[in-house]
């Protein structure tokens, strides 16, 4: 299988111009042992390492060379400070340094070991030695312990014990070091079974910190699942149990096969190379591939391409490599537990059928060559897993046979008729995703089944919107869809839980989810390309024309509902009619809303909030009503205005309001005001307006969430800069505006409504209501408002993204409105700047829908000129140019 190899090989070309390696510190004279000279020579060594790396020298060679250099430096300093004359003391390398692995910024962990506690003079000399190393800017971690203290502290602390297990003598008393080794490898010091289980728990806890996946878009090369720590865990376990000090020795002890050893060596080499490059880019120790470092690292590793392509190619290789490490790590730890430790007598396997048996709760092959002889048996195993809830996983030796068979397939599994029948049977079974598709993905069987899947494995997008790679995102979409069958999901997704049981064929939704992003990374429109793939796959798997076309439509239109709800004016009947015409039926609408919600939730866990939920619900029910009414029948807007007014009046009469005064207020309002507000909102506004001093602006902050956010209502004399003043103040208060409805009455009073959220997507905190209200009052009263208020600086993370500003004017038959879709880099004060431009050009804003997608904003503004007409072509051009000039600053704020 192709998952054996990375797609974009690194350049390893050696050049003959590399300078000679600096001399080792063991040759230094006593007169050289001072900070300036040592720092100068250490800097020269580090320059040589960078030069050698850039010239193609392998990371393995350079890592070992650095460890060797530090060995010689410490040996020379040990002698210089007279410790060669101190009996029963030793200097010991521990941790990664103990393994002989030092990257440019790695910690240098050492143990000063002694038989008896050091006297004051010797302790002072140790302090001088360590201080000198710190003055050289080396990251040195040290401990000074007696042999007895080492053993006691090692027994009490797993990390200390692990460091000691991979200790290595640098210089000093050999017998003392061997005595320590004898103790730490004895049965009384962390017995192998106890050590193993402690390291497994430690790994599980570490993985949880990274959400159980190496596919985070800013991974930690060392600690993320599938990273170097997972290889270290295997080494630690084998070191403690067998005394093995390398991957090759693990083969000798039967813990690894030759193929597995080679695969781990290749993986370690790749991860070392990326980590070495990262350390050359940084000035302080860190192992995280953050966005602002990825391009520099990719270029250092000679990845090529336009724009973000070098990063995407490098990260694809990284994710594919960590997948392999994760699979090997899980399999080998399981194998160690089941076959080598054998803590309990092996439970007698229970036959499941002629081919498979159950060992505990793990499925196991009865014939180890079955998968090679009959590749379709792989699918039979996963079909058994989805049908039998007693099966919780795959036995380690069967995973080993599966990996072997997978690499020797002559054609994709979907070319086998029986495999296709089994695949569809899996999809139609409850629990298909969690019990079959997820493990199929983890063991690269989805890739072996459908070649298209391989192209998205590890495929990232260099942005702040997509939290996972395309394959990981797709699996999360599938899992989210499956959760809609669970009543426990109802509180978070009530609409989807209500609709999911009404889908006639849920397997078609799973197929659409499987293909919705399958064409990403190919170039072109991934929705259209993916729909083409989906039709071919559906027909190959025996679906009829209606079923195939539904799957293809869902793939082609999987973004339609999200875009319409978040970036279009869904209170405009024309928008609802256009959307309904595409959807065509209530059945397709139910499929589409389920896919849309799952897609949003699986893109980024922070995206889903009550605001988005309210938008999708509103669009769903408006479309359902339109489909039931019939496409030829548009809503009666006059009747809706009358209905809203009557309902609001009924609410207000309960408060014994002055109806004559109310009608004076309402008579100044235009029809749009009544159309776009609910009766409850109309009554809320009216109650306060009737009691308010009409010579002052009114600011209301709703105590109850409106469409998932907090509603802020402003009544004030209108002026061109009002919108900019309000949104500028809201931005200064760290509130995000998601929706704005702007109305100007016949008497020139503005009646504006804003929906705002806190940074975490929640409604405005109650204790902030009076503060925000007062701040807005002051902002509105500033008659000299000319420029947006001083805004926060662009965040460091955003500085590394480039989003060219686009001003797209959407087609419409409305002669009184222009619909502007603005795409730009998200930046503090953006709305205030945009509002200032509108004011400068004399444009009136009627509504705004604000959508932030990672580092991008994709906003919709409904505009008119001073004569309440759509913008002329000349005005559009000027507006587009002003927006580009303002939102594409060269210094990025």
UniProtKB/Swiss-Prot annotation:
Reported regulation of activity: Uridylyltransferase (UTase) activity is inhibited by glutamine, while glutamine activates uridylyl-removing (UR) activity.
ACT domain sequence ranges: 711-793, 819-893
Alphabetical keyword list: Hydrolase, Magnesium, Multifunctional enzyme, Nucleotidyltransferase, Repeat, Transferase
Annotated ranges, domain HD: 470-592
Region Uridylyl-removing: start-end pairs: 352-710
Gene Ontology MF terms in the entry: [protein-PII] uridylyltransferase activity; phosphoric diester hydrolase activity
Cofactor(s) required for function per UniProt: Mg(2+)
Annotated EC: 2.7.7.59, 3.1.4.-
Annotated catalysed reactions: [protein-PII]-L-tyrosine + UTP = [protein-PII]-uridylyl-L-tyrosine + diphosphate; [protein-PII]-uridylyl-L-tyrosine + H2O = [protein-PII]-L-tyrosine + UMP + H(+)
Entries under SUPFAM superfamilies matching the protein: ACT-like, HD-domain/PDEase-like, Nucleotidyltransferase, Nucleotidyltransferase substrate binding subunit/domain, Poly A polymerase C-terminal region-like
InterPro entries recorded: ACT-like_dom_sf, ACT_dom, HD/PDEase_dom, HD_domain, NT_sf, PII_UdlTrfase/GS_AdlTrfase, Polymerase_NTP_transf_dom, UTase/UR
A Gene Ontology BP annotation from the UniProt entry: regulation of nitrogen utilization
Domain remarks: Has four distinct domains: an N-terminal nucleotidyltransferase (NT) domain responsible for UTase activity, a central HD domain that encodes UR activity, and two C-terminal ACT domains that seem to have a role in glutamine sensing.
Function, in words: Modifies, by uridylylation and deuridylylation, the PII regulatory proteins (GlnB and homologs), in response to the nitrogen status of the cell that GlnD senses through the glutamine level. Under low glutamine levels, catalyzes the conversion of the PII proteins and UTP to PII-UMP and PPi, while under higher glutamine levels, GlnD hydrolyzes PII-UMP to PII and UMP (deuridylylation). Thus, controls uridylylation state and activity of the PII proteins, and plays an important role in the regulation of nitrogen assimilation and metabolism.
Family: Belongs to the GlnD family.
HAMAP family cross-referenced by the UniProt entry: PII_uridylyl_transf
PANTHER family xrefs: BIFUNCTIONAL URIDYLYLTRANSFERASE/URIDYLYL-REMOVING ENZYME, BIFUNCTIONAL URIDYLYLTRANSFERASE_URIDYLYL-REMOVING ENZYME
Protein name listed in UniProt: Bifunctional uridylyltransferase/uridylyl-removing enzyme
């Amino acid at each position: 299988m192709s998952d054996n190899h990375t797609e974009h090989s690194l350049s390893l070309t050696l050049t003959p111009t590399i300078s000679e390696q600096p001399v080792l510190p063991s040759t230094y004279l006593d007169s050289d042992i001072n900070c300036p000279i040592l720092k100068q020579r250490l800097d020269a060594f580090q320059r040589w390492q960078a030069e050698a790396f850039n010239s193609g020298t392998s990371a393995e060679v350079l890592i070992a060379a650095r460890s060797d250099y530090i060995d010689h430096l410490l040996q020379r300093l040990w002698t210089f400070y007279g410790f060669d004359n101190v009996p029963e003391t030793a200097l010991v390398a521990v941790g990664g340094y103990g393994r002989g692995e030092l990257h440019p910024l790695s910690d240098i962990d050492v143990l000063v070991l002694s038989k008896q506690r050091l006297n004051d003079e010797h302790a002072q000399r140790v302090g001088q030695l360590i201080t000198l190393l710190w003055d050289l800017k080396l990251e040195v971690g040290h401990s000074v312990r007696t042999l007895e203290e080492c053993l006691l502290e090692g027994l009490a602390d797993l990390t200390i014990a692990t460091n000691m297990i991979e200790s290595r003598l640098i210089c000093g008393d050999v017998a003392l070091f061997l005595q320590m080794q004898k103790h730490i490898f004895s049965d009384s010091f962390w017995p192998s079974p106890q050590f193993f289980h402690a390291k497994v728990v430690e790994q599980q806890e570490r993985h949880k910190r990274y959400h159980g996946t190496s596919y985070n878009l800013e991974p930690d090369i060392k600690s993320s699942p599938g990273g170097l720590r997972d290889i270290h865990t295997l080494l630690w376990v084998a070191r403690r149990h067998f005394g093995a000090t390398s991957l090759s020795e693990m083969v000798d002890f039967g813990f690894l096969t030759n193929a597995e050893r080679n695969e781990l060596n290749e993986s370690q080499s790749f991860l070392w190379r990326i980590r070495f490059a990262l350390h050359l880019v940084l000035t302080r120790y860190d192992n995280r591939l953050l966005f602002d470092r990825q391009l520099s690292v990719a270029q250092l590793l000679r990845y090529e391409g336009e724009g973000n392509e070098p990063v995407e190619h490098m990260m694809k290789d990284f994710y594919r490599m960590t997948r392999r490490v994760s699979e090997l790590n899980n399999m080998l730890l399981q194998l160690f537990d089941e076959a080598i430790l054998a803590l309990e007598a092996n439970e007698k396997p229970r036959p499941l059928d002629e081919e498979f048996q159950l060992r505990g709760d793990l499925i196991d092959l009865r014939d180890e060559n079955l998968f090679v002889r009959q590749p379709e048996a792989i699918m039979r195993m996963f079909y058994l897993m989805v049908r039998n809830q007693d099966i919780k996983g795959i036995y380690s030796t069967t995973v080993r046979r599966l990996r072997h068979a997978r690499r020797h397939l002559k054609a994709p599994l979907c070319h086998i008729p029986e495999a296709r029948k089994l695949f569809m049977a899996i999809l139609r079974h409850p629990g298909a995703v969690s019990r079959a598709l997820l493990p199929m993905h983890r063991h690269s069987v989805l890739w072996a089944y459908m070649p298209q899947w391989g192209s998205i494995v590890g495929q990232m997008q260099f942005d702040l919107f997509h939290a996972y790679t395309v394959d990981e995102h797709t699996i999360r979409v599938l899992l989210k869809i499956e959760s809609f069958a669970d009543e426990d999901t109802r509180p978070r997704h009530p609409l989807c839980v209500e609709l999911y049981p009404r889908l006639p064929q849920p397997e078609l939704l799973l197929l659409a989810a499987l293909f919705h992003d399958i064409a990403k990374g190919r170039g072109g429109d991934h929705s259209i390309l993916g729909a083409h793939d989906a039709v071919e796959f559906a027909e190959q798997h025996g679906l009829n024309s209606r079923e195939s076309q539904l799957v293809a439509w869902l793939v082609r239109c999987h973004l339609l509902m999200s875009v319409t709800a978040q970036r279009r004016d869904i209170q405009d009947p024309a928008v609802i009619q256009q959307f309904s015409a595409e959807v065509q039926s209530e059945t397709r609408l139910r499929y589409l809303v389920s896919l849309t919600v799952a897609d949003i939730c699986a893109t980024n866990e922070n995206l889903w909030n009550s605001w988005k939920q309210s938008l999708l619900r509103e669009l769903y029910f408006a479309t359902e009503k339109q489909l039931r009414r019939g496409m030829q029948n548009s809503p009666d807007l006059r009747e809706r205005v009358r209905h809203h007014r009557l309902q609001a009046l009924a609410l207000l009469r309960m408060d014994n309001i002055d109806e004559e005064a109310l009608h004076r207020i309402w008579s100044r309002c235009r029809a749009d005001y009544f159309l776009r507000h609910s009766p409850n909102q109309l009554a809320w506004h009216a109650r306060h307006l009737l009691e308010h001093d009409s010579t002052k602006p009114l600011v209301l902050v709703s105590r109850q969430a409106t469409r998932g956010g907090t509603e802020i209502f402003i009544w004030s004399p209108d002026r061109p800069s009002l919108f900019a003043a309000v949104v500028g103040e809201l931005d200064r208060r760290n509130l995000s505006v998601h929706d704005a409805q702007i109305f100007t009455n016949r008497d020139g009073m503005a009646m504006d409504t804003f929906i705002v959220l806190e940074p975490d997507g929640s409604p405005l905190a109650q204790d902030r209501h009076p503060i925000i209200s007062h701040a807005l009052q002051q902002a509105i009263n500033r008659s000299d408002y000319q420029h947006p208020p001083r805004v926060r600086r662009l965040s460091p993370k955003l500085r590394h993204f480039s989003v060219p500003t686009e001003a797209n004017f959407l087609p419409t038959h409305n002669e009184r409105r222009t619909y502007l879709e603005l795409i730009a880099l998200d930046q503090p004060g953006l709305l205030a700047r945009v509002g200032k431009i509108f004011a400068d050009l004399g444009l009136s804003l009627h509504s705004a829908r604000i959508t932030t997608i990672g580092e991008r904003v994709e906003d919709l503004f409904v505009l008119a000129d001073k004569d309440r007409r759509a913008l002329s072509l000349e005005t559009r051009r000027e507006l587009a140019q002003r927006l580009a000039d303002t939102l594409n600053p060269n210094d990025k704020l």
